[in-house]
Amino acid sequence: MSYKTPRLGPNVVKRAAASRQTIKGCHLTFAAPPVIEVLASLGLDFIYLDGEHGTFDFKDIETACVAAERHDLVPIARVPDRTAPTITRFLDRGVRGIVVPHVDTVADAEEALDAIYFSPAGNRSFGGGRPFFTAIEDLPRHLTDCNDNVSVGIMIESVAGLEAADKIAALPGVDYLSFGLNDLAQALGFPGQPSHKEVARQVEAAANRIRAAGKPIREDFMKIAWINQVLLAGMRELMARPTALPY
């Protein structure tokens, strides 16, 4: 009996990080597959599932990935920690990109990379995860496909992270870096002031060193709206123009 071997399609996030081509997506903090379907109709490229601050459990993550894949959206997720068991479960549910928060050192980043990539690039565990856990006739090729098509974003959210940013950026397997501005503002002594000029100065300096190391920051290629911003903007528009309501 012959089987159709599933193949991973290209990861638009990973490609865009390399080419600096602009892509668009939405940040979700709650499980809402119908919302993913609505967003897909707007021509977005990816969905960002917030597994650190959001309400998702692993069943929610899998359902969101199924909805995203159905509409050709790449699902990426911010994980709550960089440990191998956590990262493995996100990847096994169908997430195509991992965003690692609170990375302070090169060793922190290497720990995450080791969990994200299969050998020889890392030591990711292989088991019964989706979406490609059946009918794999060529397992070595499948593992290579996984490595070639998983995106990795590293978040800098501390003073130590700022200092190590360029060294982290130079690591093979890191596609892009981003800044957790609220946590950075606290770490720099300006809680609740992510737009403070000193925060902006330190972020700009680190961003320039990251680019000099050959990697982009998220804002260089990714446009992302948070779902709360989308909902508030839409409701304000409807309240300002009641005739826009369909009934």
Report residues per predicted region:
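Alpha-helix-loop-beta-strand connector modules within alpha/beta enzyme cores
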Residues: 58-92, 116-121, 144-148, 195-218
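N-terminal amphipathic alpha-helix/helix-capping segment at the start of soluble metabolic enzymes
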Residues: 1-27, 136-148, 204-212
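Short, acidic/polar
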Residues: 28-41, 81-89, 159-171
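C-terminal alpha-helical cap/extension of soluble enzyme domains
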Residues: 124-130, 134, 150, 156-163, ...
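Glycine-rich, proline-tolerant flexible connector loops at the mouths of alpha/beta enzymes
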Residues: 35-62, 181-197
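Active-site mouth loops of central-metabolism enzymes
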Residues: 17-33, 76-80, 150-163, 224-232
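Conserved anion-binding
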Residues: 85, 97-172
